[in-house]
Amino acid sequence: NWAERYGLKILIDLHTAPDSQNGFDNGGISGVCKWSQEPEEVEFELTVLERLAQRYGRREGLWGIEVINEPITEETWEHMGVQERYPAVDPVKAAGTKPNTLEFIRQFYLDAYDRLRKYLPEEKYVVIHDAFLLKAWKDFMREDKYKNVVLDTHQYLMMAEGMGCEQTVE
C-alpha cells in the first residue's frame, strides 16, 4: 500500500519473457531470443499480464502496465549485430534463436491490450515499446477503441551507432 499511502504511481513493466524477447542480457538470457517461436510461452506471458491487471488494475497507485520491455525485430537485430554483441551464455539453448517479426509484436500488443482491458479500467495506461523502430508505430492502435495507450521509446547510443543518427534524432 506504499504507493497509495505516499501518493506514488506505479508502472508495472514485464522486463523479460520466457526464452527472451531480445537476446540481450536484460532479456533474461544473453544470446537467446526464442519467445515468439513458442506459442505456449507467448500464452504464458499474456496470462501473466492478465493476472497482473486482475490483481492490481483497480489499485489507486497503479498508473499502468507495460506489456514487454524492448522486444527486438529483424531489422534491429541485424543493425545491432545482436549475436556478436551478446554471445550466447548457453549455446544449446540458443540454437534456433531468431528475432521477432514486427507483425508478431503488433499482434502480441493487440492481444495483450484486449486481455488487459478485461480487468484494467480505461483510465489506466497500457504501455507498448517501440521495438527500436519508432516510425513503425505512427498509425498503430490509433482507433478510438484503444484508450490510454502509451508508446515507450528508449533512445540508446548503441541504436544510433547501429541504425544511424537520423532515426535517433527523429
What is the predicted role of each segment?
Residues 1-16, 20, 24-67, 108-115:
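An active-site-proximal structural segment forming one wall of the substrate-binding cleft
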Residues 47, 54-57, 61-64, 68-170:
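Extracellular glycoside hydrolase catalytic/binding regions
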